[in-house]
Curated annotation (Swiss-Prot):
Transmembrane segments: none annotated. Keywords: DNA damage, DNA repair. Pfam families: DNA_mis_repair (PF01119), HATPase_c_3 (PF13589), MutL_C (PF08676). NCBIfam families: mutl, PRK00095.1-3. This is DNA mismatch repair protein MutL. It comes from Geobacillus thermodenitrificans (strain NG80-2). This protein is involved in the repair of mismatches in DNA. It is required for dam-dependent methyl-directed DNA mismatch repair. May act as a 'molecular matchmaker', a protein that promotes the formation of a stable complex between two or more DNA-binding proteins in an ATP-dependent manner without itself being part of a final effector complex. The gene is mutL.
Length: 645
């Protein structure tokens, strides 16, 4: 007698449930997705014991006929697709016909449903077996209750986490679905307590506020981009609004929440050098494309997808985010009384806005007397005693005298003084225009130069030899001088590292680097990559290398330290990428060459530093993502001194 036999349906469903029903959140996801596919406009989810005891989902969707109710709990029975051609043009959230039978096989299910055109149907199942079937009320929609999850698979129960953890997973699922479908009203309750409520208005900003809070949602800016194959819309948080994990990035593809690491990497690339290490933004992206370009039939849970043109989509997302930040002044403002502001925000009707300080227009797009970034950083890297380029210092007084005359004449006429009412009016301004990223690279560069993102700042002093104090008509600014020159140096060195140059400095005494045998071999395999960054390693014995020259723009006195850092990156990186290697080298050199704390600067040096900073691509954060400038509005300062209440 043969040893191979066919499994009965209940056992097969239990096996399938191992992939589909991982935890209570999986049940919530499948049931709510069914409600959305049924054209529901309102969905209520009720949980007890984080869903382990009870999960109830009520919707006002299409409902089901009696014969469809029975068929819905059969394996691979679905109304979503008809043939194999439909499999490549999936617009619904469900299509496999596995969820309901898998859920029913490991729980007790009660289903009440009706199409609204006649009496409804009630089914009761236990462990996948039909227990009762009867007529029910004719309310249009579906009411399904899943109880005693995993009652017949005790081994699965052992892997469940605490109620708090499981509830967090379930709430996260509902949050993502609410973001993906803002036109559907969602209400999530746990033991009668409302955890989430959305109004189904279709405005995703209201959903963001319901999930992350009103203050966070107000600090998110809209983006929009389109290519031949993709349309991307969404909201991204300002660089100062971050979290400790990537869990706050929500990616929606054709209405389906997905997890995709390459897309998350593309988002992070858009925030390049704007985020501190280990911090991640809050992002909501809704991506629309032809279903042919995405394969959702990768895993039964339908969270993983594959794209046909993934590289093109990644580039579009990165460019869109970068363009959004190029058009904005990203200076964080300090609130005088955060508790009071928060309380007012919760009481008042709110709007979403990011206050943008528009700098005074320059006739030619560039302030008079400002020096070229590369020339300034080049002079700084030559090791002169002055921390700032001499050329910039020479030009600075002309700028400063003219600027100071302008500012103080305005102060005398009362133009500069910000009135509280005007400040409040700016706070209430709504920024509705999304950012589009459809311009070629040179056009984007021209636009960046035309819009002066960092307003002119007029120094008034220095705090502890570390922070520059400056002012303009918008209030007081504190500038971290080390971070500011780090940004200037970083952009200079990044450009130099990408150039092919024969300008090298020969060393009278070669530098020697010795490593263990295993590390020596790994370094030797990457000599070409290091050479493309200006580091030419020459084998010297069985475990050592010599460096006889280096590019002339290497920071003087820091050559060995920088080369060691670059070699260390080669040793620690899983794969050596020339772009990452140059990036790391630029960051290291910019930090080593920057002004340090407790270093007092002359007025002309401060002017030169600020004017050079204004010419950089991203003057708001250092290469490590730390802020360079913090803003105190005149209104907030007046609140500190109780001049306004």
């Amino acid at each position: 007698m043969g040893r191979i036999h066919k499994l009965d349906d209940q056992l097969a469903n239990k096996i399938a449930a191992g992939e589909v029903v991982e935890r209570p959140a999986s049940v919530v996801k499948e049931l709510v997705e069914n409600a959305i596919d049924a054209h529901s406009t309102a969905v209520e989810i009720e949980l007890e014991e984080a869903g382990m005891t009870k999960i109830r989902v009520i919707d006002n969707g299409d409902g089901m006929e009696e014969e469809d109710c029975l068929l819905a709990f059969e394996r691979h029975a679905t109304s979503k697709i008809q043939d194999e051609h439909d499999l490549f043009r999936i617009r619904t959230l469900g299509f496999r016909g596995e969820a309901l039978p898998s859920i029913a096989s490991v729980s007790e299910v009660e289903l009440v449903t009706s199409t609204g055109s006649g009496p409804g149907t009630k089914l009761v199942l236990k462990g996948g077996a039909l227990v009762a079937r009867e007529r029910a009320a004719g309310r249009k929609g579906t009411d399904i209750t899943v109880s005693n999850l995993f009652f017949n698979t005790p081994a699965r129960l052992k892997y469940m986490k605490t109620i708090h953890t499981e509830l967090g997973h379930a709430a996260d699922v509902v949050n993502r679905l609410a973001l993906a479908h803002p036109d559907v009203s969602f209400r999530l309750r746990h033991h009668g307590k409302t955890l989430l409520a959305t109004n189904g208005s279709g405005d995703v900003r209201h959903v963001l506020a319901a999930i992350y809070g009103m203050e966070t949602a107000k600090q998110m800016i809209p983006i929009e981009a389109e290519s031949l194959d993709f349309t991307v819309r969404g909201y991204i948080s300002l660089p100062e609004v971050t979290r400790a994990s990537r869990n706050y990035m929500s990616l929606i593809v054709n209405g389906r929440y997905v997890r995709n690491i390459p897309l998350m990497k593309a988002i992070e690339a858009g925030y390049h050098t704007l985020l501190p290490i280990g911090r991640y933004p809050i992002v909501f992206l809704a991506i629309e494309m032809d279903p042919v370009l995405v394969d959702v039939n990768v895993h039964p849970a339908k969270l993983e997808v594959r794209f046909s043109k993934e590289a093109e989509l990644n580039e579009l997302i990165t460019a869109t985010i970068r363009q959004a930040f190029r058009q904005r002044t990203l200076i964080p403002s300090v609130s005088a009384d955060s508790k009071t502001v928060k309380a007012k925000a919760e009481q008042a009707s709110w709007t979403f806005a990011h206050r943008v300080h528009e700098p005074p227009a320059q006739p030619d797009g560039k302030a008079e007397g400002t020096s070229d970034v590369t020339a300034a950083a080049s002079l700084a890297s030559e090791g002169s005693l002055s921390p700032l380029p001499a050329a910039a210092q020479a030009d600075a007084p002309a700028v400063s005298e003219e600027a100071e005359a302008s500012v103080f004449s305005e102060r005398r006429t009362g133009v500069v003084n910000d009135l509280p009412a005007a400040e409040l009016k700016r706070d209430a301004e709504v920024e509705e225009e999304p950012t589009e990223a459809c311009l070629p690279a040179d056009e984007q560069a021209e636009e960046k130069r035309a819009v002066d993102r960092l307003p002119p700042l007029y120094p008034i002093g220095q705090l502890h030899g570390t922070y520059i104090l400056a002012e303009n008509e918008h209030g007081l600014y504190m500038i971290d001088q080390h971070a500011a020159q780090e940004r200037i140096n970083y952009e200079y060195f990044r450009e130099k590292l990408g150039e092919v140059t024969n300008e090298v400095q020969e060393l009278l005494v070669p530098l020697t680097f010795e490593y263990p045998a295993d590390e020596y071999e790994r370094i030797a395999a990457c000599r070409d990559e290091l050479a493309r960054c200006g580091v030419f390693l020459e084998p010297f014995g069985p475990r050592a290398f010599l460096v006889r020259s280096h590019p002339v723009w290497f920071p003087k006195g820091k050559e060995k330290e920088i080369i060691e850092e670059m070699i260390e990156h080669v040793l620690t990186a899983k794969t050596v990428d020339i772009k990452q290697l140059r990036e790391q080298a630029a960051i290291v050199m910019s930090c080593k060459r920057a002004i340090k704390a407790n270093q007092h600067l002359r007025t002309d040096e401060i002017f030169a530093l600020l004017e050079t900073l204004r010419q950089t691509t991203d003057p708001f954060t250092c290469p490590h993502g730390r802020p360079i400038i913090v803003h105190f509005s005149t209104y907030e300062i007046e609140k500190l001194f109780k001049r306004v209440m």
